[in-house]
Every structure is written in structure tokens, then in C-alpha cells.
Design a protein with these regions (language model features):
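Short, flexible loop/turn elements at secondary-structure junctions
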Residues: 26-28, 39-44, 57-60, 77-82, ...
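ATP-lid-like helix-loop hinge signature
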Residues: 1-40
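Bergerat-fold ATP-binding/catalytic subdomain of histidine kinases
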Residues: 52-68
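Short helix N-cap motif at coil->helix boundaries in the Bergerat
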Residues: 43-51
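GHKL-type ATPase core
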Residues: 66-169
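Short, charged/polar micro-motifs that form catalytic or ligand-binding hotspots
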Residues: 38-43, 64-68, 72
């Protein structure tokens, strides 16, 4: 290809891009590992997490073609394969990308723990907030080191799925 190189060159560029922007880690038990997915996309600020990443019934994703949640492939689709009825958890950690963050506010990390609750006839999802109903947050001082490996998380979104059921690992 005149502008992008041949197929090998295009695949090499895609691979290099993916290494920088998308990470999938598995640890623990082979049939029920803890999976960590890091997407170094735009991320969300703590005050936006409740209306975006963990929001199930809103229309925020309807007009955005590239988000998984629009196609029911986001976090709520994955959590049903986590753990057991007694413990079904997913960690959400996010920080807005510096290039699009609101410069008038601190650009902190936000986090919550999501669980699928089976205490009624119909299971439902719920997530943790502080006592005022806000998403938990902490100051950004430097990128977080992930599990002692050579990966740093500065912004984007990290989803950790605990005891994820893999039928055929």
C-alpha cells in the first residue's frame, strides 16, 4: 500500500499500538483466573464513572459507536461470569486522559467495586460509593505499577474481573 505499507507493516503498527493502549492479564487459577483489562483510552474522572462505566440504563453510549457498552459487551456483560453467587465482583479504576481532562479540577483516579447481588428473586448489579454517594477517589501522584510487572497505569480504564469462569481455558 502506497501510504500505509504492506500488510505486514500495517499489522506491526497495530501490534505496537495495542501494546501501548490495551493490556489483558490473567493470574491465579487456570479455570477461574482473575482477569485485568487495561484500556488506555479516554478514561473517566471520578465524578463521571457513575454516569458512564457503571451506568446501565442511560443513553450516554447510544451515539458513540466505539464503546463496548453500546453493544452489551461492557462490564455488566462480563461480571456475570465472575465468582459465584456468594461473591461476584469486579473492580473499576479509571482516570481521565490528561489531554481531555478538565483543567479546572484535579485529575484524580476514581474507583468502585461492582457486584452482582443475588439476594432477591432477580439478580441486580450494585456498586460501592462513599457515604455521600460519590465515587471513591485518590490523588494522582505518579502512574500506578500494576502487580509488580513492567506496566504502569496513568490514565484510561482498568477493569479487574475476579474468579472469571473460563469454560475452556
Amino acid at each position: 500500500n502506497k501510504y500505509f505499507g504492506g500488510e505486514d507493516e500495517i499489522n506491526k503498527k497495530r501490534s505496537e499500538w495495542a501494546k501501548k493502549h490495551l493490556v489483558v492479564l490473567a493470574e491465579g487459577d487456570k479455570k477461574k483466573p482473575t482477569l485485568t483489562v487495561i484500556d488506555r483510552g479516554e478514561g473517566q474522572s471520578p465524578e463521571r464513572i457513575q454516569n458512564s462505566i457503571v451506568h446501565l440504563s442511560g443513553s450516554i453510549k447510544r451515539n458513540v459507536d466505539f464503546v463496548f457498552g453500546k453493544y452489551h459487551q461492557g462490564g455488566s456483560a462480563a461480571i456475570r461470569f465472575c465468582g459465584s453467587k456468594a461473591k461476584c465482583y469486579q473492580l473499576v479504576l479509571s482516570r481521565r486522559a490528561e489531554t481531555i481532562a478538565d483543567k479546572s479540577k484535579p485529575n484524580d483516579y476514581g474507583w468502585t467495586l461492582v457486584r452482582r447481588n443475588y439476594k432477591s428473586r432477580t439478580a441486580f448489579y450494585e456498586y460501592c460509593t462513599d457515604r455521600d454517594g460519590n465515587t471513591f477517589s485518590f490523588k494522582f501522584e505518579k502512574p500506578l505499577k500494576i502487580d509488580g510487572i513492567d506496566i504502569e497505569f496513568a490514565d484510561g480504564c482498568l477493569i479487574r474481573l475476579y474468579d472469571y469462569y473460563l469454560d475452556n481455558p
